[in-house]
């Protein structure tokens, strides 16, 4: 069965989700809603400064987007309730505007005829959040779910392996995060986050993140044991998690690496990667995994106190897991 998917919001994640869908035979994008017109949408899809030119034919016919010969409905509705997803038989909507992050707002897609909704960000209410490979088996048929954040998708698989094998007493996470669309090119007003309004290309900017605390929702036994912060840095894509934890059961750094490597080849294959080479951030660009553990970057103070490093393409890795979650909730 091919899953029919609509995208609401054709920004960075919306477009990378679209690109990722082209590599799958179980998912078809049948509709896109954004305030962009179809011609500009085609241009934004065709050319990408981070991921390169789109591999395929992109054109516009009669106000619709035609990609590799397949017609995709284009709409420009501000209110999701008016989207008439039923007219194109949409199974799942990818809600990637960043605006509709709660059950009551995302439910407008259901009212418009979609069967299910995946929110591409942490939910603002108790809408369940899922990280593939970590808690996806707890899905109970909910119509509206969240794919959490890109950082939570990097951190949670790593935390799961550590907690399962050695136990986590407590931990602090820092994500060194690439620039995102919410930042300013030059200093500008940012009433809620003064530092966040400073020029993205000129500064390393300390910021808040709920990614570590969110792991407590994904792995309940870690609730209250993890918190974290972010540094926004002037790179276009690829971020890295620095996780420092105190372990319940002692383990050498090699034992920890061995456990992560085994998980990357076993139950977390396709989600968690393992690298034992001298890589840098650009080497991860385009990697579909959500977490790539760097065995050469971590350090151990003693057998109970360790710092681990894991990379992630915060666009590609996350967007690929959106599709994996879609496939999971439509089984």
From Swiss-Prot:
The record marks 177 as: Activates thiol group during catalysis. One of its GO terms (cellular component) is cytoplasm. Pathway: Carbohydrate degradation; glycolysis; pyruvate from D-glyceraldehyde 3-phosphate: step 1/5. NAD(+) binds at residues 12-13, 34, 78, 314. InterPro entries: GlycerAld/Erythrose_P_DH, GlycerAld_3-P_DH_AS, GlycerAld_3-P_DH_cat, GlycerAld_3-P_DH_NAD(P)-bd, Glyceraldehyde-3-P_DH_1, NAD(P)-bd_dom_sf. It is found in: Cytoplasm. This is Glyceraldehyde-3-phosphate dehydrogenase, cytosolic.
């Amino acid at each position: 069965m091919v899953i029919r998917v609509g995208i609401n919001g054709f920004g960075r994640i919306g477009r990378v989700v679209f690109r990722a869908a082209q590599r799958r035979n179980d998912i078809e994008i049948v509709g896109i809603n954004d305030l962009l017109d179809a011609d500009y949408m085609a241009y934004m899809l065709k050319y990408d400064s981070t991921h390169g030119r789109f591999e395929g034919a992109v054109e516009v016919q009669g106000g619709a987007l035609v990609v590799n010969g397949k017609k995709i409905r284009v709409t420009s509705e501000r209110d999701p309730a008016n989207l008439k997803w039923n007219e194109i038989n949409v199974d799942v909507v990818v809600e990637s505007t960043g605006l509709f992050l709660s059950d009551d707002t995302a439910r407008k897609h259901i009212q418009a005829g979609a069967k299910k909704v995946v929110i591409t960000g942490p939910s603002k209410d108790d809408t369940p959040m899922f990280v593939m490979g970590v808690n996806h088996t707890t899905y109970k048929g909910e119509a509206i779910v969240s794919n959490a954040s890109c950082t939570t998708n990097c951190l949670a698989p790593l935390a799961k392996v550590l907690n399962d094998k050695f136990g986590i007493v407590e931990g602090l996470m820092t994500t060194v995060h690439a620039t995102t669309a919410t930042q300013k090119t030059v200093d500008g007003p940012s009433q809620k986050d003064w530092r966040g309004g400073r020029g993205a290309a000129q500064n390393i900017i300390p910021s808040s993140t709920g990614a570590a605390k969110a792991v407590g929702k994904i792995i309940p036994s870690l609730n209250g044991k993890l918190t974290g912060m972010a540094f926004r840095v002037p790179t276009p894509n690829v971020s890295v998690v620095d996780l420092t934890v105190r372990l319940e059961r002692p383990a050498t750094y090699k034992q920890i690496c061995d456990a992560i490597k085994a998980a990357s080849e076993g139950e977390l294959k396709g989600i968690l990667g393992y690298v034992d080479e001298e890589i840098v951030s650009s080497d991860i660009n385009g990697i579909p995994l959500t977490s790539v553990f760097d065995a050469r970057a971590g350090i151990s103070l003693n057998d109970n106190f360790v710092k681990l490093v894991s990379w992630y393409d915060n666009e590609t890795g996350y967007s690929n897991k959106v599709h994996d979650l879609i496939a999971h909730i439509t089984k």
